[in-house]
Design a protein with these regions (language model features):
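ALDH superfamily catalytic-core signature
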Residues: 6-8, 13, 30-32, 36, ...
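PLP-dependent aminotransferase-like
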Residues: 1-24
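Short hydrophobic/charged patches on amphipathic alpha-helices used for structural packing
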Residues: 25-29
Length: 186
């Protein structure tokens, strides 16, 4: 909020309201002063917002929703491999891969496939998973037990295609997941 105000946005144009979506969201969405909604989060919540907005009386207002997706990067022979690796590691694994904009699929041109894959495997093996407050940590835990199980089950379903997993030198009973490279065809 401070940065928006510092950039010149009028004070009356932006308010930060914290609270449970079910309690606050419904009230806000039904207020006739609301002329648009921008949302980042789950598809389930975006659907709830869309349904609430569709029941509003009066004009139809726009909804911009950024939800989870299968974001991908295409790598061809003109790409700088070192930059590709940096971008892929940051986008795919930082924030424990939990951003809705996190890289999920890396499509690599055949001519640069082996070099890129080998460098990506090397970089993945260097990732330190650990406590977020330690300077030596690259990646912290996922949000909860369900997220950990969902991710690990996905990895297990592709266990014969795993090309690399960073070491996990922390309590496996907590919410940590190994950053993993899975090779898929087509």
């Amino acid at each position: 909020v401070k940065l928006f105000l510092k950039a010149g946005l009028p004070t009356e144009s932006l308010q930060l309201l914290l609270g449970e979506g079910e309690n606050i969201g419904n009230i806000i969405l039904n207020d006739i002063r609301i002329k648009g909604v921008v949302f980042t989060g789950s598809c389930k919540t975006a659907d709830k917002i869309k349904n609430n907005l569709s029941k509003r009386k009066g004009e139809i207002i726009p909804l911009f929703a950024e939800t989870g997706g299968l974001n991908f990067m295409i790598v061809d022979s003109s790409a700088l491999t070192e930059q590709v690796i940096d971008d892929a590691i940051e986008s795919g694994f930082y924030s424990a891969g939990q951003r809705c904009s996190a890289l999920r699929i890396l499509a690599i041109q055949d001519e640069v496939y082996e070099k890129t894959l080998n460098m990506l495997i090397g970089a993945t093996n260097e990732i330190t998973v650990g406590l977020p407050y330690l300077l030596s940590t690259d990646i912290g835990p996922v949000i909860d037990h369900d997220a950990k199980n969902r991710i690990n089950n996905h990895i297990k379903s592709f266990s014969n295609k795993v090309k690399a997993q960073s070491p996990l030198n922390i309590d496996s009973h907590s919410f940590y997941v190994q950053p993993t490279i899975i090779e898929i065809d087509n």
